[in-house]
UniProtKB/Swiss-Prot annotation:
Function: Transcription factor. Transcriptional activity probably positively regulated by phosphorylation. Modulates expression of target genes, acting by binding to regulatory cAMP response elements (CRE). Acts downstream of the calcium-triggered CaMKK-CaMK1 signaling cascade, consisting of the protein kinase kinase ckk-1 and the protein kinase cmk-1. Plays a role in learning and memory, feeding behavior, stress response, entry into the dauer stage and modulation of lifespan.
Gly residues composition-biased segments: 161-172
Gene Ontology terms, MF aspect: cis-regulatory region sequence-specific DNA binding; DNA-binding transcription activator activity, RNA polymerase II-specific; DNA-binding transcription factor activity, RNA polymerase II-specific; identical protein binding; RNA polymerase II cis-regulatory region sequence-specific DNA binding; transcription coactivator binding
Tissue distribution of the protein: Expressed widely, including in head neurons AFD, gustatory neurons ASE, the olfactory neurons AWC, and in the ASI sensory neurons, as well as in the intestine and gonads in hermaphrodites.
Identification of the protein by name: CREB homolog crh-1
Keyword Zinc among record annotations: no
Source organism per UniProt: Caenorhabditis elegans
Domain bZIP: 266-317
Protein location: Nucleus
Polar residues bias: start-end ranges: 71-84
Family per record: Belongs to the bZIP family.
Record domain KID: where: 16-75
Biased composition range(s): Low complexity: 173-199
């Protein structure tokens, strides 16, 4: 009974290491499978060299496109700026004698839109607006509509910018030196003709006086139309404009030095071309040497062939002589 108890007590002790070994083996097998699966997942997640190169190329393209997408700075005047420049000089407070369409320029304050004729000429006579101002501003739509209408001269065909002389004299042209002043129409003309003449003269004078300080151009009279136009100094050869710093900066940024990636690629290409040239020179030199060596060998072989032929001839002659002597 004691021995059986001892065996029964020893059996679990003896079998426990085997079970532990089996359990460890199973655990290691499971761990190895998990590790293999984990490694496969990591390898799948890890980007390949092709993906890395693709990312680098896209980054280079983005860097190249960034300076190209920046638009060059423009110096064009906006319509609001143009409208602010085209506004007439500040008006004086209206009096009982002044009409809504008549502006009396003050002699104390100088107008910011001064003409080359001087402020004294403009201050002597009132400036006539052919249209009623809208909210204190000049009505540009009405001015454009009036300018598009044909100009009618009552005294017949105009000559040298003046209306033909019927009964009431001619309309003074812009060569008189006063642009945009009130025009005295002939007495025989109708009210619609007077209004058209005043609108044309007033519009041309206002636009001319407003555009002169902005564009820096001189007034030129055209006798065919009886209005003032502007001749740009660029047509006479005296125009010279300095580029703005924003434009020069944009052009330097756009077409200046290449980027770092382009510089590196150009340098590598030049190095590759130099290496190719050196290799081609070396190849040609070796080819010439090889051809010379072959020519030398051919000449040596030809000389040896000649010597062997002569030796063969002498041997034949000796052999023939011996045969003759033996017979």
């Amino acid at each position: 009974m004691a021995t059986m108890a001892s065996t029964s007590n020893c059996s679990p002790v003896a079998t426990s290491p085997l079970m532990m070994l089996l359990f460890k083996a199973l655990q290691e097998g499971g761990d190895s499978e998990d590790e293999a699966r984990r490694r496969r997942e990591q390898l799948n997640r890890r980007p390949s060299y092709r993906m890395i190169l693709k990312d680098l190329e896209t980054a280079d393209k983005v860097m190249k496109k960034e300076p190209e997408e920046t638009p060059p700075s423009s110096v064009d005047a906006s319509p609001l700026q143009f409208q602010s420049v085209m506004r007439p000089p500040p008006t004086a407070p209206p009096t009982s004698a002044a009409t809504p369409n008549r502006i009396l320029p003050s002699s104390n304050a100088a107008s910011p839109y001064g003409s080359p004729l001087g402020s004294s000429i403009l201050s002597n006579q009132p400036l006539v607006l052919p249209f009623a101002p809208i909210n204190g501003d000049f009505d540009f739509s009405a001015a454009i509509a009036a300018a598009s209408q044909p100009k009618v001269f009552p005294g017949g065909p105009q000559q040298n910018g003046l209306g033909g002389g019927g009964g009431g004299g001619g309309v003074p042209g812009p060569s008189s030196g006063i642009a945009g002043m009130s025009v005295q129409p002939p007495t025989s003309s109708t009210p619609s003709q007077q209004q058209s003449v005043q609108s044309l003269e007033g519009t041309s004078g206002l636009i001319g006086s407003a555009m002169k300080p902005m564009l820096g151009i001189d007034a030129v009279s055209f006798p065919e139309f009886g209005t003032t136009d502007w001749q740009s100094p660029m047509l006479s050869g005296g125009y010279s404009s300095s580029p703005s710093p924003t434009m020069t900066g944009g052009s330097m940024r756009m077409g200046g030095g290449p980027l770092h990636g382009e510089d590196e690629s150009n340098r590598k290409r030049q190095v590759r071309l130099l290496k190719n040239r050196e290799a081609a020179k070396e190849c040609r030199r070796k080819k010439k040497e090889y051809v010379k060596c072959l020519e030398n060998r051919v000449s040596v072989l030809e000389n040896q062939n000649k010597a062997l032929i002569e030796e063969l001839k002498t041997l034949k002659e000796l052999y023939c002589r011996k045969e003759k002597d033996g017979m």
